[in-house]
């Protein structure tokens, strides 16, 4: 949500659509159906019950439906590109260190080294995902956040080994 607002302030786009799509994009987690599909259905029904403009509801539903298709080269609206980039940015940076550290802490054999390897693996998996960013502003921020992780890993290596 916060990344969507930050990107919108740089790039423009309909703030109402961006905010509502960002807040509701993951509402449809489901084990049997793609969560974009489920989420779009839930969001459309909910927003309709609130009396939101039907044209905005349609755009929000479309964004939620396809937000997880990060590898698509489809002709996406600015609002959709912003929500997709915000979704990627929400997963990387300092917050990922916290998530990995907390996940490691609840393991049976928690240690600093296990947290280090988990964070390093996260970095390795997520660094190439910069190519999934749909806006230049998203790519720039993603790059900064990955640099933060790289610097953190470098410092942690100096302290652990």
Q: Where is each model-derived feature located?
A:
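Alpha-helical phosphate/pyrophosphate-handling elements in metalloenzyme active cores
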Residues: 1-18, 30, 42-51
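Divalent metal-dependent phosphate-bond-processing catalytic cores, especially two-metal-ion Mg2+/Mn2+ enzymes
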Residues: 2-12, 24, 52, 72-161
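His-Asp-centered metal-binding catalytic motifs of divalent-metal-dependent phosphohydrolases/nucleases
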Residues: 15-35, 39, 60-69
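Residues at secondary-structure transition points
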Residues: 34, 45, 97-99
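Helix-adjacent hinge/juxtasegments
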Residues: 37-80
């Amino acid at each position: 949500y916060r990344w969507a607002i930050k990107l919108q302030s740089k790039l423009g786009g309909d703030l109402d659509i961006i905010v509502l799509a960002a807040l509701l994009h993951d509402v449809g987690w489901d084990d049997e159906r793609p969560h974009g599909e489920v989420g779009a259905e839930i969001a459309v029904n909910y927003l309709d019950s609130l009396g939101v403009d039907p044209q905005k509801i349609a755009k929000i539903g479309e964004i939620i439906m396809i937000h997880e298709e990060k590898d698509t080269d489809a002709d996406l609206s600015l609002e959709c590109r912003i929500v997709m980039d915000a979704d990627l940015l929400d997963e990387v940076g300092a917050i990922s260190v916290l998530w990995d550290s907390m996940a490691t802490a609840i393991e049976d054999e928690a240690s600093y080294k296990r947290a280090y390897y988990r964070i390093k693996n996260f970095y390795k998996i997520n660094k190439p995902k910069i190519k999934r960013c749909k806006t230049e502003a998203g790519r720039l921020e993603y790059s900064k956040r990955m640099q933060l992780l790289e610097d953190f890993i470098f410092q942690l290596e100096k302290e652990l080994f």
